[in-house]
Amino acid sequence: MALEKSLVRLLLLVLILLVLGWVQPSLGKESRAKKFQRQHMDSDSSPSSSSTYCNQMMRRRNMTQGRCKPVNTFVHEPLVDVQNVCFQEKVTCKNGQGNCYKSNSSMHITDCRLTNGSRYPNCAYRTSPKERHIIVACEGSPYVPVHFDASVEDST
């Protein structure tokens, strides 16, 4: 009887460990929508002409860990306005996919580009504040931005 109880407990423990092994890796994984927000949203500030803005933000948002991300764009608009782009003009993404959308109006953005000669771990960026239409890839339920594809000038 005691042997049976021990065996049942052991089997239960093994089963629990197996389930935790399958579930646990997905618990800490950042969703594509959250990654988009971390890498591209800066609603709390306006476009900065400060030459150090990109250096600070790229470090703060963990985009200089292990390598220097060559290009990144921050959007200075409310998140809901950027999410609404997913229901505006449908365009083809740079990679040929059909899930990109262009904003109806210009948005305040800051382009960050790695400066020539800049090498990890000393990533240095050029800061360029702009007003442009943004193009984002959207997916999921709810349908939200998951990739910043491009920014384009007003065509009028």
From Swiss-Prot:
Its EC number is 4.6.1.18. GO terms for cellular component: extracellular exosome. Changing residue 117 to D: Substantially decreases binding affinity for RNH1 but maintains high conformational stability. Changing residue 116 to A: Substantially decreases binding affinity for RNH1 but maintains high conformational stability. One of its GO terms (molecular function) is nucleic acid binding. GO terms for biological process: defense response to Gram-positive bacterium. The active site is at 40 (proton acceptor), 147 (proton donor). PROSITE patterns: RNASE_PANCREATIC. SUPFAM superfamilies: RNase A-like. Gene3D superfamilies: Ribonuclease A-like domain. Substrate binds at residues 35, 38, 69-73, 94, 113. Pfam families: RnaseA. It catalyses: an [RNA] containing cytidine + H2O = an [RNA]-3'-cytidine-3'-phosphate + a 5'-hydroxy-ribonucleotide-3'-[RNA]; an [RNA] containing uridine + H2O = an [RNA]-3'-uridine-3'-phosphate + a 5'-hydroxy-ribonucleotide-3'-[RNA]. Monomer. Interacts with and forms tight 1:1 complexes with RNH1. Dimerization of two such complexes may occur. Interaction with RNH1 inhibits this protein. This is Ribonuclease pancreatic. It comes from Homo sapiens (Human). The lineage of its organism: Eukaryota, Metazoa, Chordata, Craniata, Vertebrata. The gene is RNASE1.
